[in-house]
Every structure is written in structure tokens, then in C-alpha cells.
Amino acid sequence: MTSVVTRGRHADGDPRAPGAGRWSILALLCFSLLLIAVDATVLHIAVPALTAALEPSSVELLWIIDVYSLVVAPLLLTFGTLGDRYGRKRLVLAGYLVFGVASAAAAFAPTPSALISARALLGVGGAMIMPATLSIIRQVFTDRHERAVALGIWSAVAAAGAAVGPLVGGVLVEHFWWGAVFLINVPILVVLLPSAARLLPGGRTRSDRPWDALSALLSVLGILGLAFGLKEAGAGHPGGAVVFLAGAGTLAWFVHRQRRLPFPLLDLDLFRRPAFCAGVGGVLLTVFSLVGLELMLAQYLQLVLGDSPLQAAVRMLPLMIASIAGGLTGARLLRRFGLRATMSGGLALTALSLTPTLAWGTEGHPIALTFCFVGIGFGIQVTLLAASDTIMSSTPEALAGSAAATEETAYELGAGLGVAVLGTITTIVYAPSLARIPGIGPGAMDQARQSLASAAHVAQEIGGAGGKALLAAARLAFVSGLHSTIVVSVLLLGTTALAVAFLVPGRSREGRDDSP
């Protein structure tokens, strides 16, 4: 069994930080999470400026956006279990260093390939930090109600970071250049490093359990194969299906190995807990729908409605405010209504809030947009908080790192696949919907069909009536693609809400006993 030795451990073995110390730890963890959450969405607003500067292809643009999530997802389980064994504080500090170096490299990337590589390194740093934030919360907040409050704050910060990312990106792109959205991380990390070294629970984790490197490798290759294969298959590459099947086979080998090992890397008994499974599934499917749509909506505001980066970010403020409100009130809703009602209600609210966007075209609807963003932000965050509280409360402390890593894997896998799948759907619908404009050559039309940002660039170069006609047609084609992704998301969210309503217990009592 793993035992954790930390500063501030009570004499009776209670691992909570004394007094207000644990709330200071929570503040630091939330600030770390805020940095990563902002980084996940800050690029959305910068896409048009980045496209104009680096001129990536549509495939390269999707890789720039979602390589972060595709790298984070397979590494979370490995780093989560390493944190359980060798110390979460060490992993967080190392993650800060990697994240800082990668941020500087991304800021000054001269080519799309260089930016993709830097974003991948950012994913490595993020994977080192994220599981530790949840598992340290689980470590220092042992009272379930107090932990629910802490998770509510953590969830609100995650929502605020993801929602405020476009606002930060809008301000930076408006006044500097697209690379500033990454460079801003460096001075923040310079402040975080000494603070984390002083505040986070120290000591080391002692364990007689061996750490199985082969299992770690299988989990990384399996998840990466699934994500990469699905992405490539969606883009029409024939090798994608082969990679997907290879990933599935590798994960099957991983599961088989975990069942045979006396000390598995991932305790599969966690998945025998209905609440744990419901939480993980809810996170995966909810984030899948949210992240891909958020990217499309950011482009819709700028390239279809004509907003500047800052104006688009301001329009998305209701999403941020509602997300914070959902994070802060979600714990109370969960206690009052239970897991089933809270999760299914949040999913249903999100699906209903997305539905009006199917009537939008190339004209703005500011009031309707505000109400839709409020419903989406609140519904998504309540769902994610309910899922997170259920996952961590149904898990003994010795497995907190594995549980946190599993949740974060679901989150990042959902984010990466959401961008890949929904982005691919948009591209598949957009390209054939953009008919040839008289007077514009085939080469220019092929470039315009790469993406709406490319079409805007071509239209600007052509100018005149032809350029205006091309931009108008491209905007209509993009709206058609956006509607397709919204339909897929609404169906997915609605189906998940029904599944939760019928299959999940009303109130989970798992996890009140922290013993393994």
C-alpha cells in the first residue's frame, strides 16, 4: 500500500494541511490549473492571426490546435501514477519547467511544424501538472463536504480559465502578435515555481509496489493510437483505420496485463464503481462536444460576423461568467439533487442552449447569443463538477493519482477528439459547400476550400467584387459546416443525458469510506 508523507501531517495520521494551509495550497493549485486552462483555449481567438502569419494548411491548423490534447491524454495516467509513487510536488515543479520552456518555443515558432512540436512539449508539461492538482486536493481535503467545496472552486477556476482564454488571447493579439499568447506563460511560471516549492506538501511517497514500465508504455501507445487513428481516419487518410485498430489492440493488451499483475498501474477495480464510470464517461462526452464547438464559434464570431479578436472575446464573456457560476453552485446542486439529476440536467441544459444556434446565418444575434452562452457555460460546468466530485469521492486516497489521471485523460481525450472529429466534420461540409466563384481560378478556389481563414486571405488578395463574392460564399459554407457540428453535439449531449438519467444511481454513497 502507498503511504504519503507530507509536511503538516497530523499526529493521528490525517493528511490534511493544518488550518488555512490547505486553502493556500488550493489557491496555488487553482492558479496552476488556470494557467493550463487558459492555454488550452487562448489559441482559439489567435487562429486567424496565426493563419495569416504562418500560412498552415487546414490539416496543419488542426494539428496546431489539438496536438496539445492528443499528447496530454496518453501521458496523464503515466504521470499520475508516477506522482503517487515518487511525489506529486516533484512532478508539479518539473512540469512547470517543461511548460515554461515549451511556451517560449511556441511563442517564437517560425513554421507550422515548429509550432506543432512546441505545442506537443506543452502537452508533456501539462500532463505532469494536471493529475497532481486533483490528487493533492484529494490528499489534503479528506472531509467529503469540504472536498466538494474545494472541487467546486477548482472546477470554477478551470471553467474560468477555459472561458477567459479567448479574452486574454483577444487582448494580446490585438496589441502584440499571436506568439504573445504563449510568451505570457513564462513570467507567470517564474512566480509559480518558488511558491509551489514553499507551499505544496513535501516529503516523498513510499511504496513497495513496483512501477510497471511496460504498462505505462502500453497505455501511452494505445491511447495515442486511438486518438491519432481516429483523427487521421476522419481526415480521409487510409492508414488511420489501421492505426486505430493497432491502438485498440494495444489497449486490450494493457487491460489484460493489468488484470494479471499483482500491482497494476491502473487498478481496474475502479471501473467496478458505477459512480466512477459515470463520472469518467460524462467528462469524456461533455468535453468532446464543448471544445470542438468552442473553436468553431470563435471562428464564427471573427470570420463570419466580422468581430475583432477582442470583440469576439468580449462576446464570449457570458460563457465565462456562467461557467464560474456553475462551478460555484454545482456542489450545492449535487448535494440537493444527487448525481443523476445534476448530471443529466446539466447535459440537457447544454443541449437545449445549443439548439437555437441552428437558426443562425451570417447575421449576428447578440441577445440570443448571450442566452445561449449562459446556458452552455452553466450546464457544462455543473456536469463536469458533478462528474469530478463523484470520481474523486468514490476513490480511496491511495489511488487518488490514478483516478485523477483517468479523469484528466478523459478530459483531454475528449478535447483532442472533439477538435479532430468536429473540426473534420466542419471541413467535410465546408469544402464542397463552397461553389466556384466566376472569375476566380481553380488554384485560388482550392486554397479557399482549405478553411474559412484561408478563404478570407484569398479574398483579401483578390479584392474587388470577386473577393467580396468569395468571402460571402465562404461564410455561408462555414455556417453549413458549423450547423452540422452542432447537430452532432446536440444529439451526443442529449443521448448522454438520457443514459445518465436511466443508468446512474440517484445518489452515490461510494467513497465515504476512504479505505481502498
Locate each region found by the language model.
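12-transmembrane solute porter fold
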Residues: R22-V38, L43-I45, S58, G239-V243, ...
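Structural signature of transmembrane alpha-helices in multi-pass secondary transporters
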Residues: I36, I65-Y68, V72, G123, ...
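Extracellular/periplasmic helix-loop-helix junction of adjacent transmembrane segments
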Residues: A46-P74, L305, L310-V314
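Interfacial helix-cap and linker-helix signal at transmembrane-aqueous boundaries
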Residues: L50-T51, L82-G83, V168-F176, L230, ...
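Helix-breaking motifs and short loop linkers at transmembrane-helix boundaries and internal kinks
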Residues: E55, G87, F108-A114, F176-W177, ...
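Central cavity-lining transmembrane alpha-helices of secondary-active solute carriers
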Residues: D66-G80, M130-L134, L317-T329
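Helix-loop-helix hairpins in multi-pass membrane proteins, especially solute transporters
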Residues: T81-L214
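Hydrophobic transmembrane-helix bundles of small-molecule transporters
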Residues: G152, E174-V283, S289, M296, ...
